[in-house]
């Protein structure tokens, strides 16, 4: 994820990893942000 205004927190809706806040990635099966292993 990225640090930008409006970034999605845990379980926020997303289409891609860049929609999520830092340390979060988009889980495409559920279209929500969750912890990214990286």
UniProtKB/Swiss-Prot annotation:
Species assigned in the record: Monocentropus balfouri (Socotra Island blue baboon tarantula)
Role, per record: Paralytic toxin on insects that inhibits voltage-gated sodium (Nav) and calcium (Cav) channels in P.americana (American cockroach) dorsal unpaired median (DUM) neurons, and also inhibits the B.germanica (German cockroach) Nav channel (BgNaV1). May act as a gating-modifier toxin on Nav and as a pore blocker on Cav. In vivo, reversibly paralyzes both L.cuprina (Australian sheep blowfly) and M.domestica (housefly), but does not affect larvae of H.armigera (cotton bollworms).
Disulfide bonds: 7-21, 14-26, 20-33
Tissue expression remark: Expressed by the venom gland.
GO molecular function: calcium channel regulator activity; ion channel inhibitor activity; sodium channel regulator activity; toxin activity
UniProt domain comment: The presence of a 'disulfide through disulfide knot' structurally defines this protein as a knottin.
Protein name: Mu/omega-theraphotoxin-Mb1b
Residues recorded as bearing Serine amide in the entry: 38
Subcellular location(s) of the protein: Secreted
Top-rank lineage group of the source organism: Eukaryota
Homology family: Belongs to the neurotoxin 10 (Hwtx-1) family. 28 (Jztx-11) subfamily.
Entry keyword annotation includes Disulfide bond: yes
Record's GO cellular component terms: extracellular region
Key words, A-Z: Amidation, Calcium channel impairing toxin, Disulfide bond, Ion channel impairing toxin, Knottin, Neurotoxin, Secreted, Toxin, Voltage-gated calcium channel impairing toxin, Voltage-gated sodium channel impairing toxin
UniProt miscellaneous comment: Possibly exists in two forms, due to cis-trans isomerization of Pro-5 or Pro-22.
Major localisation: secreted
Alphabetical list of InterPro entries matching this protein: Huwentoxin-1
